[in-house]
Each structure stands twice: as C-alpha cells, then as structure tokens.
C-alpha cells in the first residue's frame, strides 16, 4: 500500500524540432560529451513510496545503453508550520558511463535541496544544487533533468562542478479573489563552473525569470491556459560556449484535457 512501481524501455525519441523518431543521444552543450554518439535503448526501473500523507520517497535506476547510467533518490516532505506549509524537496543523481561509453567519460554526483513556505497565495522558495565529479550532469538530448534547475529558459545549470543557488516567489491570485491567475519571479545563479572542452574554469552564470499565467475558468475554453515568460540570462563563458547572454520572451498556450 502506497508503493508505485515503474519500469520502462525506450528505443527512440521524437524531439520537439523533429518530425520523426531517432536514436537517443546525450545532451552536450559546451561540448561536455560526444553528442554524436547514439544509444540503442534506455531502460529504467524504480518506484515511489508514500510513507504517509506528508512524506514520499523515490528511487530509480536508468541505463542509456553504451552512454551513461544514473541512480536517482528523492525525498519530498510537507509540514504544517504556523499558518502555512513548509515543503522540502531533496534529490540526488549519481551518474557514470555505461557499456562502451561512446559519449566519453561520465563522472558526476548532483545533490540538491529546495525548501518552500506557502501561506495564503504566497510561496517563497530557496534552493541549492551542488555538482561534483569530473564531468557535467548527463541527460538525454531533447529532454530535461527533473532536478532543481528544470524549466530554466537559457541554460540548464548542470555544468561540471557547478554550485547553484536559486530563490523563487510565487503568487496565486485566487487568494485575492482572481482565480486562475498565477505569477512567478525566479533568480538562479551558478558559479565554480568548469568548462573543460573550452579550457575555462571558475565561471559564473545567472538567470532572472518572470512569469504570468491565466487559466480560463469557465465556458467553451475552460482549462485553456495562457502564459507569458521572460528571462534575462548572463554569463562569463568564453567564445564558443553553447549558452550566451540573451533575453528571451515566450508566449505559451496550454490545455489540460480531463480524461476521467
């Protein structure tokens, strides 16, 4: 009771900028790995265990054949504190090369902690992520690692030896009588970055994000969401780096379709 077991096997991936299914490769911004190497398949196994209503645990093992393997552990916890709720999200990723290591050496440990406090329509969160080992944190090209840096817009903040801090402020306007409207301010800063292929170390990057979204509450367009996202990104990486100074603005249309 409370245990969910998952396993899967994937041999092709359809990226957002492609019309067909292709073999998987390893994400390699800043020439971290051999991004041209492909894998015949990925297999994973693991599960989630709901210890009680406030605590859940997660453990997974994944292998991207002949590229890398990764073990993931996570702890999610909520605690009523005063008028609000304290949330804790602890995650770890341990990665090494797999099989013939066609993408090159993989040696990374990534540990993160994100703590938030929600009261009324407000939510304040602070987090820290620490990468160690000789390489960046690996993930499949065209996807995102489900860690603390997910949904950043201009960088993945997963470089070798990177130490990342972030602060987030969310507000749900339902608390002010305007249901469906939500906003976010987010600041992410990484330092101690090592870019071996670019002969650079002790580099820094930072990203500031703003979001405003609205989900239509009724009528024929009920559950259609509109979102605007803005980011300002800066770094001191050398020429030739994949991530460069930029400002991004995105507009999204989202739709959630209830099945049951």
Regions found by a protein language model. Name each.
Residues 1, 48-51, 77-81, 116-119, ...:
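Residue-level signature of outer-membrane beta-barrel architecture
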Residues 2, 6-38, 42, 84-160, ...:
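Outer-membrane beta-barrel translocator/channel fold
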Residues 2-7, 14, 53-58, 82-88, ...:
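Repeated loop/turn-to-beta-strand initiation elements of outer-membrane beta-barrel proteins
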Residues 5-7, 11, 45, 55-65, ...:
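Transmembrane beta-strand segments that form the barrel wall of outer-membrane beta-barrel proteins
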Residues 13-17, 53, 63-69, 81-83, ...:
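Gram-negative outer-membrane beta-barrel proteins
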Residues 20-37, 41-49, 58-61, 72-77, ...:
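Outer membrane beta-barrel transmembrane domains
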Residues 121, 125-217:
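C-terminal structural cap/anchor segments
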């Amino acid at each position: 009771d409370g245990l969910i077991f998952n396993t899967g096997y994937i041999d092709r991936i359809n990226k957002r900028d492609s019309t067909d299914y292709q073999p998987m490769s390893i994400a390699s911004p800043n020439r971290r790995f051999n991004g041209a190497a492909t894998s015949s398949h990925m297999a994973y196994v693991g599960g989630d265990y709901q210890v009680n209503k406030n605590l859940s645990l997660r453990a997974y093992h994944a292998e991207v054949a002949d590229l890398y393997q990764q073990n993931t552990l996570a702890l999610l916890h909520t605690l009523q504190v005063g008028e609000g709720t304290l949330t804790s999200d602890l995650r770890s990723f341990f990665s090494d090369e797999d099989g013939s290591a066609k993408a090159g050496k993989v040696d990374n440990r990534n540990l993160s902690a994100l703590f938030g406090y929600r009261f009324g329509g407000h939510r304040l969160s602070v987090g820290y992520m620490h990468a160690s080992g000789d390489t960046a944190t690996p993930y499949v090209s065209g996807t995102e690692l489900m860690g603390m840096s997910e949904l950043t817009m201009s960088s993945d903040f997963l470089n070798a030896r990177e130490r990342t801090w972030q602060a987030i402020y969310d507000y749900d306007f339902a608390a002010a009588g305007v249901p469906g409207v939500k906003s976010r301010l987010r600041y992410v800063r990484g330092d101690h970055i090592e870019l071996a292929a670019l002969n650079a170390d002790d580099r820094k990057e930072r990203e500031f994000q703003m979001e405003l979204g609205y989900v239509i509450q009724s009528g024929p367009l009920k559950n259609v969401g509109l979102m605007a996202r803005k980011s300002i990104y800066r770094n001191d990486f050398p020429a030739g780096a994949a991530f460069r100074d930029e400002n991004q603005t995105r507009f999204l249309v989202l739709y959630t379709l209830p099945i049951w």
